[in-house]
Amino acid sequence: MPELAEVRLTADYVNGMVEKKTFFEVRKNPSHKGKLFECPDSFRISAVSRGKEFKLLLEHSGGTEHLLMTMGMSGYFKVTPTGEEIKHSHLMFDAEDGTTLSFVDVRRFGKWSFNDWNKDRGPDPVNDKKGFTDYVMSNLSKPAFNKPLHEVLMNQKYFNGIGNYLRAEIIYKLGDVDPFLPARDAILSDRGSDLLELCSQIPYEAYLLGGGNLYTWETPQGIEIHTSLGSWTDWMQCYGNPSMEKILDGIGRRFWFDPKWKK
């Protein structure tokens, strides 16, 4: 599933590919359960992300519509010549220059609706670092933080954008905090500020590296990869590493961690 880095890169791709295009029509693959909606005869498109959330902004003479989209397990966008959309394209925007922006979703888990950001998700740890930190600290008394650190890092209400591989790298690179401690204790420890800093730093590094080379993810065309951080395989030290331990956590996801924390 795309995490913060991949969703932000998706927004970059869309913005880079459609910046000067004018669109006139929207189409939907009838095999998808999502609703087809009407658009003005002439509109522009831009994209923005917040954690794992993604929006297309449809700007026209009457204002701007906010199309909130979930990427599902493997959703992404692709620009092609109109009529040459790739297989599993489910929502298509046709431009006047003869190209089409398509939402491609092999597993059809992605959804769309006209809405603002989800009120049940917290601030973006990268784009709104202070807001993220303040939000976590102001909610530490909530029962959610009684759970182990490794599970709470997956709670999108507080850690919007942190997913399976990012939590593994955050905890591993923090180094000396037991991931099975209650999250509240870990955050209030003398390493708590470092933990929250890594929740911003690690997703941003993954973004600079072009996103996770995991499963169906491919870095979008035209995205600059910052090689100063090394290669993705060098950077990814914990997740998927056969020398690490792994368990199924309380939410059914596989958690990779340093063997020193094995109980």
Predicted regions located by residue number:
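Short hydrophobic "helix-edge" motifs at membrane interfaces and signal-peptide entry regions
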Residues: 41-43, 152-154, 242
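C-terminal accessory segment of soluble enzyme catalytic cores
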Residues: 200-263
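Hydrophobic alpha-helical segments with strong N-terminal bias
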Residues: 36, 145-147, 236
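Generic detector of intrinsically disordered, low-complexity, polar/charged segments
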Residues: 48, 69-72, 128, 158-160, ...
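Phosphate/anion-contacting hairpin/loop surfaces
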Residues: 63-176, 180, 185-200, 251, ...
